[in-house]
Amino acid sequence: MGEGALAPGLQLLLRACEQGDTDTARRLLEPGADPVAGPEAGAEPAGPEAVRAAEAGAPVPVDCSDEAGNSALQLAAAGGHEPLVRFLLRRGASVNSRNHYGWSALMQAARCGHVSVAHLLLDHGADVNAQNRLGASVLTVASRGGHLGVVKLLLEAGAIVDHHTPSGESPATGGSGDELLGITALMAAVQHGHEAVVRLLMEWGADPNHTARTVGWSPLMLAALLGKLNVAQQLVEKGANPDHLSVLEKTAFEVALDRKYRDLAEYLDPLTTVRPKTDEEKRRPDIFYALKMGNFQLVKEIADEDPNHVNLVNGDGATPLMLAAVTGHLPLVQLLVEKHADMDKQDSVHGWTALMQATYHGNKEIVKYLLNQGADVALRAKNGYTAFDLVMLLNDPDTELVRLLASVCMQVNKDRGRPSHRPPLPHSKARQPWSIPVLPDDKGGLKSWWSRMSNRFRKLKLMQTLPRGLAANQPLPFSDEPELALDSTMRAPPQDRTSHLGPPEAAHATKDSGPGNPRREKGDVLLTTMLRNGAPFPRLPSDKLKAVIPPFLPPSSFELWSSDRSHTCHNGKADPTKTALPPRASRAHPVGCVGTDGATSRPVKFPSISRSPASPASSGSFNHSPHSSGGASGIGGMSRLGGELHSRSGGSVDSVLSQIAAQRKKAAGLCEQKPRQQSSPVGPATSSSPPELPASLPSSGSGSSSGPSSSKKLDPSKRPPSGTSATSKSTSPTLTPSPSPKGHTAESSVSSSSSHRQSKSSGGSSSGTITDEDELTGILKKLSLEKYQPIFEEQEVDMEAFLTLTDGDLQELGIKTDGSRQQILAAISELNAGKGRERQILQETIHNFHSSFESSASNTRAPGNGPSMAGWTRPEETVSSRR
């Protein structure tokens, strides 16, 4: 035992326990005590050196152990010395102590079949389900030895019959038992041919079909290995599966044949349905091997012989169709599809389909074929990617492949009526048939970053994708960049607009229902224009991504992206293509063209604004000023950079200033005319909020109210009843009547649209900070409409977006009840009215500050940079006093 390193007293105690010498153990543990009884029968008497050591030495600890961790109690239990075990337990020996291999005293007694000792240990609280480091339990070691009495005792004491996982309370297991075979007590008894123990375990519910990990052997296979016919019969009677295959694909019948146990083989032969493969079958390659070799004829023979082979799954969970899609052999793909291979099956590792494999490996012809055969483009891999997402991840994606997948994905979304919560494509709809995709013939390509913004572009309300609370003078990186500005790539030529569906920036707030609504075709125009005018660079630097925001998105806290909405003011007439859009009724306000949104779809002319500079959409340049309308109305566009920025948008400084000077003279008269201008054919549209200051004035330090000249030219008696608001500050360019407008709805829309336009045009105002979702939740709770909260959360509608919703938007969100929509619209109207008054006070304060500042700095103002702020004060004060 290697006791040389132990103290003499410990060596004597361990030797006495191993030999069953109770007297010596008592002398060592109780110095000075008289022996009560002699040594146990069969035990060696203690030598004179042991007696002297016991008389002269100090007491020896009862839980001492040798180098292997075996304690005195374990040695006594292994030897079956019941009196010594009883004495050690009385002296306080630990009943559940383990040696270095995880063996306890009970396991030692069970291994050797000592029933009385095992019973004594169980009475003192020994763990009946303890396991050693090999994962063997107390019941397993007892079954291995065939000790029927101990097995029965353990089962009656509560031992788990199929306990094959390591016990977590064992201090020495270390979790390594999970990597072992997982042998159960039944398997141990079968392996060693103990029929009585097998019968007892089966009566206690042992699982006859439990298999050992890593090798896949069952108890029936172990019986076949030993040729134990009686044991095999017991197992089959209890439900053992004779068709079970090991990892070597062998059954118990084949094991018996290999071991030449004829009687056992004859017994298992009629019970086994999985027949052994012949030598020819073993030599014949499977369909995966044939696909890897590209042998079309062999694949065809295998598929003809058994069509089920086309849907086999290999170790990685891949199907033959996936392998063919990777290799790029179109004839093989066609053959497998004709044999009814599952095109939409996903592998078990990554969740990829055959379409994803073909897309990722650039096999364009296979992608076309699979799409024509109806492969599902909406399926997502385990990481959430679709086939379209995968092609966008490529460093140099094939442009035609991108168009192909994009058109089909849009058609799928169109067929489904509306995009799901996570559609597979960043764009919404397409006009091409699914089976025969027709792609735009252009040479550009989508950028890889476009897929990152897909979820934002498809939302009902897009303003939550824009940064909030940005300063009015924040630099914008699209000014002098060598590549095309995004608004330029999105526009169509002005002379061709009547033949197109309309610019995408005008379609994002329309409805999906109803004939002639451009929303159902917006995504196609968006995709087509992006493909035709995509920037030549394959990737954009990461530091530019924050600036890649399409100009047609509704503004959040400044009006940079509303420039393209000024088409109604170009050349003094409305854009014919925009008259097909539903209206958002709006009260007139001093910024932009002075007029209100009407309810009809007739084109409206604005002769007073014919001198306005071209908007960025038609000029191809981008205005730096966050408050510029791109020259749409010629007013409200002066920023801190003065006329220089207006000239960048294609306009003239003199033209802008002359219009400003002319229009600011009639700011007061304009406000008086407003109630008369708000009547419309669809119902009352009188605003519930007081008129506000020009929202572009406070933040930019320059801006203007409408003057007398513009008011005179836009006299209500001469304005068509369907007058469209020429301001570019509208967050929803909706210009045609809703399907079923009502008076209350129109009134709510008026307040929502007008107030939101004014609040958004103040670049650094407080309106951009209203983003608390709790506020929106509280509003819905007050209205007792909490059931619609998940709808707003799903569409990411924050408080800022909520204030811009119209009746049509609410219907599109899924709020079908008229009463609920009316409640929400009334709440929006009241909120916009209150926030408008708050902004008015703030704007007046900021305006007074700028007026004082400009007056002090008027001596240093460079000529041509715009009029002094001091000259802008009187019209604003007049307007405020009349409010």
Swiss-Prot record:
Residues 566-576, 874-883 have a biased composition (Basic and acidic residues). Residues 30-50, 414-439, 490-522, 566-773, 852-883 are annotated as: Disordered. Residues 771-834 form the SAM domain. Hydroxylated at Asn-129, most probably by HIF1AN. This hydroxylation results in decreased NEK8-binding. One of its GO terms (cellular component) is cytoplasm. Keywords: ANK repeat, Cell projection, Cilium, Cytoplasm, Hydroxylation, Phosphoprotein, Repeat. It is found in: Cell projection, Cilium; Cytoplasm. The keyword Mitochondrion does not apply. Expressed in kidney (at protein level). The record marks 821 as: Essential for ANKS3 interaction. Residues 607-630, 687-711, 720-737, 748-768 have a biased composition (Low complexity). Residues 649-661, 852-862 have a biased composition (Polar residues). The keyword NAD does not apply. ANK repeats lie at residues 8-37, 68-97, 101-130, 134-163, 181-210, 215-244, 282-312, 316-345, 350-379, 383-414. PROSITE patterns: ANK_REP_REGION (PS50297), ANK_REPEAT (PS50088), SAM_DOMAIN (PS50105). Pfam families: Ank, Ank_2, SAM_1. The modification Phosphoserine is found at residues 649, 732, 740. It comes from the Eukaryota. Required for renal function. Homooligomer. Interacts with NEK8. Central component of a complex containing at least ANKS6, INVS, NEK8 and NPHP3. ANKS6 may organize complex assembly by linking INVS and NPHP3 to NEK8 and INVS may target the complex to the proximal ciliary axoneme. Interacts (via SAM domain) with BICC1 (via KH domains) in an RNA-dependent manner. Interacts (via SAM domain) with ANKS3 (via SAM domain). PANTHER family: MASK PROTEIN, PROTEIN KINASE DOMAIN-CONTAINING PROTEIN. This is Ankyrin repeat and SAM domain-containing protein 6. It comes from Mus musculus. The gene is Anks6.
